[in-house]
């Protein structure tokens, strides 16, 4: 039904040209898609080698078409968080606007709060409306110009119409042993990203590469960040509160238990804080990639 919906929109819905920004970091796009490269994996149930693919979430600068950050895996809040975190930690800039679709984890309160922190304006597009997101157009060209050269290229997604967008599946299935492992395939993809970023931008009259365009220019609407500001951006505030107990501050996330005590300047347990706050509930601010410490926030 989804592909029929796409075809209907392409045929009958009015099309609006997207006016792209003239400067990098004015607008970032984020989207999840199938990573169109096969890798070999062992099927334990059927005791045989099989060809598989995975998904990737990419963040792209709309002006330069520079790929800024990625995360391997299905589109959800975790992959969104990891990809945008990579983009901001690498380039240390807060874009003016971010556009995503309405799929994945964007509707979760924690996701909405996260996107509100990392840009000045966050918008979503309609699902399955390819023309509304320039990243899908760029990713199509990325596949055609770079990824298709690899022997384990799967062909583009089912909505692609060009014959060159598809590959001989039978040939690949007969040669599964020649496919790369998952880690080797990920390295292939990262090399493809590097090639794309170092290619000339299609609208540059001087042959400026995407990387050169992105690193040379910058939008006055974007905000430069230092190391501390970047770290603070990625701390999340827990949705639920936790009661401080005799054992300290104890909670579970993703089926893993975490225990914390509050210490004074000498490195000893702060008994004054401990005695005063047993039974008091706090929300906590945490870094999902560094759980060595958390901040307690009064409810």
Mark where each language-model region is.
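Active-site beta-loop-alpha junctions of metal-dependent nucleic acid enzymes
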Residues: 70-93
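Globin-like tetrapyrrole-binding proteins
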Residues: 6, 96, 102-225
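An acidic- and aromatic-residue-enriched active-site/binding cleft used to recognize and process polar
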Residues: 33, 61-65, 72-75, 100-105, ...
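Short, surface-exposed connector motifs at secondary-structure boundaries
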Residues: 64-67, 91-97
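C-terminal, beta-rich DNA-binding module of retroviral/retroelements integrases
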Residues: 38, 186-299
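Intrinsically disordered terminal and processing segments
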Residues: 1-26, 113, 117-129, 135-136, ...
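Mobile-element integrase/transposase regions
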Residues: 1-55, 66, 83
